[in-house]
Each structure stands twice: as C-alpha cells, then as structure tokens.
Amino acid sequence: MRAVIALAMMLSGALPAWADNSPAPENQQIAGLIRTPLMLPVTLANGQPALLEAFVTRPANNDPAPVALITNGTADTASFDRFVMNPNRYASTAIAFARHGYAAVVVLRQGYGQSSGAAEYAGGSCAQPHHQLAGERDRDTLLAALKAIRQQPWASPKQAVLVGMSSGGFAMLATGAANPPGVQAIINFDGGRGALDGKSFCDQPGLLKALTDYGKRTTIPSLWLYAANDRAFPPAAAKAMFSAYQKDGAPVKFVAMPAFGENGHTFMDSAPEAFWWKPVANFLQQQALPYQPIAELPQTQLPVPSVLNDEGRKAFQEYAASQRYEKAFAIDAQGDWGVSYWARTRDEAAESALGYCAKQQEAGKAGCHLYTINNEVVPEQTVQR
C-alpha cells in the first residue's frame, strides 16, 4: 500500500487578534494547558510597526508564568518560509515547555508565515550572507516580541528563556548578546546559519566572528544541543561554532545529542519530548527555573486501523504518540493512507490528509475517509477524490 505524508500546510485565513486570548474551539487543546493562536503587534527598535504570527501554550490559569520565547528555523526556499511555515511546526516544543510551567510562545520572525516584513536573509547571498546584520534584524524582532508578550497578565515580566533551532538558535544567541533584563537562559537547538551540505558554509569565518562577538557580550547562560547526525551542522562544525562563542568566557554548555532519524538537525520540532527534555531540565534547574511537570502528557489509546500494512501501522503508531497540534490521519478500505502534521487548523489537517490519501488510490476505488483528527477517532466521512 502506498502513502504520502503531508508535513506542512499552505496559508489560509487570518488568525485571531492578539487581544483575543480565549482559546478558539476549533483549535486543539491539551488538558491543563491553554492554547491560543495570535497575531502579535510589535514596535521595532527603529519605531516601525510589525505584525508577527504566533501562538501561546500556557498553564490553564492566569498566574504570571516564565516566558519561553521559541522561534523558527529557515527552510531551503523563501517560498516555503513565507507560504508554508506556520507556528504549529514547533508545537511539540511549546507543549513541552508549557507543561513544565512556562507560557510558551512560538513567534515566527519577520518574513516567515503570516508575519510582516522581510526575512533576515533578504538582500544577502551565499557570497555575502551578512551574518551579523541578520542577527541584528532578528534581535530587534525578538526583543520587540518579548516586550509585547510581557504585557500580558499570564506572562512574567522578570523570567524568560530564549529557545530556537537552526537559524532561530543563531537568532536567540544574537538576542542574548543584548542581555535583555529578566532573560535567564538561552537554549540553542542545532543553531547556525549558512549551511550548504554539512561540509561547506556560506562565509564560515563571518559566522564564527559573529558568534565570538555574541559570546563576548552576553552574560546569560546558554545550553547548546546538537545531534550526532545533524546534516547541516555536523559535530565538527558545531564544535567550531561553540569554540568561537566560548572564546572569551561565555557561560555556555555543549551537549552532544544522539542521532535522530535521518537528519538530527530537526530534532527540536520532530523528536518526542523524552528525546531532549532531560538535558534541558537539568540546565533549567541549574538556573533556578521551572523544570518539573505541572500537566501530564495525554495518554492516547487510538486503535490501529486493521487495513494498514506494516508501513502504515508504523506511521499510525508514530502519529498516535506525537504531541503536535493539528494533525490528521486518513485511510481507505484498501489500506492507502495519508497523514498531516503541522497544519494551522484541524480543518486544514483533515483536508491535507484526505488529499494525500486520495492521491495514492487506484482509479475506481472507494474514497478515503478521515480516521482521526488530533487524538480522536472521528465518524467515517467518505470523500471521493
């Protein structure tokens, strides 16, 4: 049997305004947590306004919680960054922090998803990637985001953690070099810029120079986690960046993570919490920040569809175990299947899973139907494609 996995969704309609903090019923919720999509209006350092696509996942109360500000990486193409990227791609990371007591806010920087403006790499090239300038642009965006978030009653004005992967990890190191008041830790998942094939880089000397500058200026402790099979920044490259950052005594710890999947570069957004939380928890504890769970992960007992072959059963078991917002699984009577992760809404997840299942069918066969949306089995809804 054949199947296609849809890992991202195209843009759709507008999101709720920042002022609307009530969870929308069509958005998946987890017991003990509140999740709300956001459009975050901010004012940049130059006085210009910007609008950032985001969502918050936080404990189900209005007590001020430490902020975990989480930001995105960069894809291979600008079209993906703009038209496919959405905050739910980092849902598993946000859920992990929220269930340990944080107001976890995923913010897409300018130029990504429905955020306004141009990406930090706009105007650059591999010959001239402008690493330092990119860091400055991202720093200004993220500092503005943190300021706006701290105006909310559920956000602590005195405690925050900066979290990012890939280019987002680099962005958080740049932000940390400004030593924002109340930021107590930086967590860098496979961070960097300008990777080509894991062996060559766009202006690697410039990248190392920027990291040396950030390390020299920061007083904030940081944790660096890099997977053994990171295809963008393999161990030698990761160690070179770490050495540059640590050169002048920056308070930083490096953790070599095990291999994950085919490319460990994406483990922050793809690996289960159990893969990476222990070293993060140890680091947070050392900074006197929350690290113990306040909400349990949902225990899903979804029956595996009997029509699936071994490949399909494995995919469904991974689906059932994954803690991600807005996902769906579709099947037909012959065992064709399609799965969608990282959609903006449950309707988009359903449509995508159905579409990819239908593409695998032989002509004349009965249509695919949704089997699950998020963590619930749904009544059969046959859709002819």
What are these regions (language model features)?
Residues G124-P153:
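Alpha/beta-hydrolase active-site loop
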Residues D63-A65, G73-S116, A195-L196, R231-P234:
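Short substrate-entry loop that stabilizes the transition state in hydrolases
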Residues F260-P272:
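Catalytic histidine-centered segment of alpha/beta-hydrolase-like enzymes
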Residues L142-K209:
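Primarily recognizes the serine-hydrolase "nucleophile elbow" in alpha/beta-hydrolase
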Residues T71-G73, Y226:
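The conserved beta1-alpha1 loop
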Residues A185, G191-G249, K253:
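The feature captures the conserved acid-bearing segment of alpha/beta-hydrolase catalytic domains
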Residues D20-N62:
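N-terminal cap/lid segment of alpha/beta-hydrolase-fold proteins
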Residues P221, K253-F254, D269, E273, ...:
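Secreted/extracellular ectodomain signature
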